Amino acid sequence: MEESPLSRAPSRGGVNFLNVARTYIPNTKVECHYTLPPGTMPSASDWIGIFKVEAACVRDYHTFVWSSVPESTADGSPIHTSVQFQASYLPKPGAQLYQFRYVNRQGRVCGQSPPFQFREPRPMDELVTLEEADGSSDILLVVPKATVLQNQLDESQQERNDLMQLKLQLEGQVTELRSRVQELERALATARQEHTELMEQYKGISRSHGEITEERDILSRQQGDHVARILELEDDIQTISEKVLTKEVELDRLRDTVKALTREQEKLLGQLKEVQADKEQSEAELQVAQQENHRLNLDLKEAKSWQKEQSAQAQRLKDKVAQMKDTLGQAQQRVAELEPLKEQLRGAQELATSSQQKATLLGEELASAAAARDRTIAELHRSRLEVAEVNGRLAELGLHLKEEKCQWSKERAGLLQSVEAEKDKILKLSAEILRLEKAVQEERTQNHVFKTELAREKDSSLVQLSESKRELTELRSALRVLQKEKEQLQEEKQELLEYMRKLEARLEKVADEKWNEDATTEDEEATAGLSCPAALTDSEDESPEDMRLPPYGLCEHGDPGSSPAGPREASPLVVISQPAPISPHLSGPAEDSSSDSEAEDEKSVLMAAVQSGGEEANLLLPELGNAFYDMASGFTVGPLSETSTGGPATPTWKECPICKERFPAESDKDALEDHMDGHFFFSTQDPFTFE
């Protein structure tokens, strides 16, 4: 650190120290708060020191700490920060004044605090003067500072507890909000996925629409090209038609020219016959005619080779016709020139007749002329053949022109057909474009319908989900109700089992008493029968045993036709009216058996009680009264009463004493028993099980 003089007052816009106390307690850490002005760049090399007020340089510090550099600073705003001085490095208590000074990395003091002291607290410092809030009283209340601080601490602790509870509540709310946010994020992810799928579908539809649009544009361009091609073909067809018409006109002209040439040739033949006298001139004329015929042959050959170039050939033919016309004109001129020669020949013949000498010469000349004439005739015949050949060639040319005309007409018809086919194809392509546009529109409509249905299905799924939750809640409540009912039924079952045990004990007691009474009565009757049988007869109507139904004993399985032994008769069989014991059925195995076996045991107990006598039934089932006994005894001991009375006493129907339901007499006895069991007994098994 460099030594530099210190200024007593901080520079304008320097570091500002906050909350500086006038005194600090020694051996306690001191916290220094300060604010850096806007535009100041804090550095880890800056430091804050505790200086004496009279210190003149930066090296006269008592202790210092490095300044803290904030993580993030906002441009144009002051920076608030703080540092702590440890208690072990602080000055000792005294009257010396100190102050905080901020020194930057260049060793320049950027700010200083007001002066303060380090001293021990005085006794009066521990007391605090309190004034009443309303200010109506002049009394000052002096209390220890510790009490005030303790009260403030308690209030702060209470406030902290309230804030902690509020924090817990807020954390719970934050947790709920986070769960809600997660649910919303999942829903958002689902919606985004659906949106992505819909976007992919839309992109696919857009791509297909773009492809269809491109195909439509291509087809439109092709249609334009085809239309232009059709127009070009129509122009070509029109041009070709004009050319064909021109060729036909030229062909007609050539035919007329050939006919004229033929007539002129015939005239020339006639003229050649007349020019037989002039052998030399005729020979020269024949030579010229041969040359012309040879030239015509060459022209015909050229015309045959130049058939494809019709326009040029026609022009050549026109030129040839003109040349032939010129030649014919020259021939006519020569024929006209032959007339004076004929006259000269006649004069020469006259001179020949007049001169004999000349006759011999003329004879020789005539012989040579005859030979020349023969040659001329042969050449004339040859020229006629050549003319006929030329005529044949001209006919062939006419046929060839007709064939070309037919071919042009066929090509024209083919071109027209191709044009019609192109038109049909263009119409089909237009219809296909319209159909594709309609399909695209339908796909858009269907996509919109799908989106609407998707939204509707989403809403319906949400409604179904809420309905499912509500139904689940109802099912849970119903399950709880059923469980409560099941518990009640179990309690009722336990009560009925307890009641059946009590009935069993009472039944055993009544059965033992009845058996003892029957044994005593039989002994007394046996003794009285031996002593005074007449007295027994007189008291027969008053005997309570005769009022009871015949006891159910072993004699029931005997002959049904035989009547039971009366009290006066000594029966060889011992009748035991004791019912079947119930205790073996309800002891031990009854706890392991099912509810159905328990119901069967209880039913057998009741039926045994009914068959044994009305008193036992009334003791066992006092709630049912005599109706159950009468009905039960009516269908259980009916055969015994029949045998005792000797007449049929079977009822036509059986009636349940509880619900008065009737059963046919011929129905199975177990049906009525099962029906009655349904009123008193139930199965302990659950009808169904909730998962």
UniProtKB/Swiss-Prot annotation:
Residues 45-125 are annotated as: Interaction with GATA1. PROSITE patterns: ZF_UBZ1. GO terms for cellular component: cytoplasm; nucleus. GO terms for molecular function: RNA polymerase II cis-regulatory region sequence-specific DNA binding; transcription coactivator activity; zinc ion binding. The modification Phosphoserine is found at S4. The keyword Cytoplasm applies. Zn(2+) binds at C656, C659, H675, H679. Residues 513-604 are annotated as: Disordered. Keywords: Activator, Coiled coil, Cytoplasm, Metal-binding, Nucleus, Phosphoprotein, Transcription, Transcription regulation, Wnt signaling pathway, Zinc, Zinc-finger. InterPro entries: CALCOCO1-like, CALCOCO1/2_Zn_UBZ1, SKICH, UBA_autophagy_assoc_protein. Residues 1-190 are annotated as: N-terminal AD (CTNNB1 binding site). Residues 145-205, 232-339, 417-514 form a coiled coil. Residues 501-691 are annotated as: C-terminal AD (CTNNB1 binding site). Belongs to the CALCOCO family. The C-terminal activation region (AD) is used for downstream signaling. Seems to be essential for coactivator function with nuclear receptors and with the aryl hydrocarbon receptor. This is Calcium-binding and coiled-coil domain-containing protein 1. It comes from Pongo abelii (Sumatran orangutan). The lineage of its organism: Eukaryota, Metazoa, Chordata, Craniata, Vertebrata. The gene is CALCOCO1.
